[in-house]
Amino acid sequence: MINGSIVALITPMNSDGSVDFASLERLVEFHIDQGTDAIVAVGTTGESATLPMNEHVTVVAQTVKFAAGRIPVIGGNGANATSEAIELTKSLSKVGVAAMLGVTPYYNKPTPKGLVAHYKAVAASTDIPQILYNVPGRTAVDMKPETVAELVGVSNIIGVKEATGDVSRVKRLRELCGNDFMLYSGDDATAREFLLLGGNGVISVANNIVPKAFKAMCDAALAGNAELAASIDEPLRGLYSTLFCEANPIPVKWAAHRMGLIECGHIRLPLTELSEQCHGLLLDAMTRAQIEVK
């Protein structure tokens, strides 16, 4: 099973909006070198909402190719039409992903019954492990632990990414879903506590720019060393909040560009590049997190 420090990878782009595959390859190498445990390709942070399906599949496939078996790649397969999610899932099943991460259908606000039916239909279209993804702040639907529990019996649904920031859900999910069901935090600010309470890993935005420290924090928390985990995590807490001074992934892309990790900080409309009033805030947070900028 995939656990530990997982990066929600940005999708680097050229100034004309095309995907910058040279920078993508460098990012994959960077995370392998820094010890990251797995990569999520083309999730929320990877701008899945603005990549058409053929481009989405290509970016995931290239990420798998660059990884070359050295680090697991999880492909984002979420959509708000079940038929589209199934089509995407079938395409991703052919490119070598270790698992897929499917966000709850957004905007159309399905009922719990609809969520269960959606995920069962998607899971039935592939043998690849599936991870549920709950982020109500973006989707307008909250998949409660009781709904997640209805999907535990589906053999290739292996876990959930819980991005509400409500760490009380760790205990409830564990009670309802059992010890073998994987629980991933999707909220950097509460990730340490999430792991110490019994979570298995973190799918992280900050991990794009502080992978070594984030890996060390995750390892310490998973080992039950709360003191060590806190000593690593506390200096990063200002960074966690500042990376959401505007909608993700606007700030983290800007930061990655300032670090020289990607050639260009371009982001696709309707998102725009980081506002000037946030530049100083983010630079200050990066400095306090001991991140070198160029």
Curated annotation (Swiss-Prot):
Protein family per UniProt: Belongs to the DapA family.
Active-site residues per Swiss-Prot or TrEMBL entry: Y133, K161
UniProt-listed Enzyme Commission number(s): 4.3.3.7
Function: Catalyzes the condensation of (S)-aspartate-beta-semialdehyde [(S)-ASA] and pyruvate to 4-hydroxy-tetrahydrodipicolinate (HTPA).
Pathway assigned to this chain's UniProt record: Amino-acid biosynthesis; L-lysine biosynthesis via DAP pathway; (S)-tetrahydrodipicolinate from L-aspartate: step 3/4
Protein name as catalogued: 4-hydroxy-tetrahydrodipicolinate synthase
Record CDD domains: DHDPS (cd00950)
Domain of life, per lineage: Bacteria
Top EC category: lyase
Reactions accelerated catalytically: L-aspartate 4-semialdehyde + pyruvate = (2S,4S)-4-hydroxy-2,3,4,5-tetrahydrodipicolinate + H2O + H(+)
KW Amino-acid biosynthesis (keyword) present: yes
Localization terms from the record: Cytoplasm
Pfam entry (one): DHDPS
An example molecular function term from Gene Ontology annotations: 4-hydroxy-tetrahydrodipicolinate synthase activity
Subunit structure: Homotetramer; dimer of dimers.
Listed SUPFAM superfamilies: Aldolase
Binding site for pyruvate: T45, I203
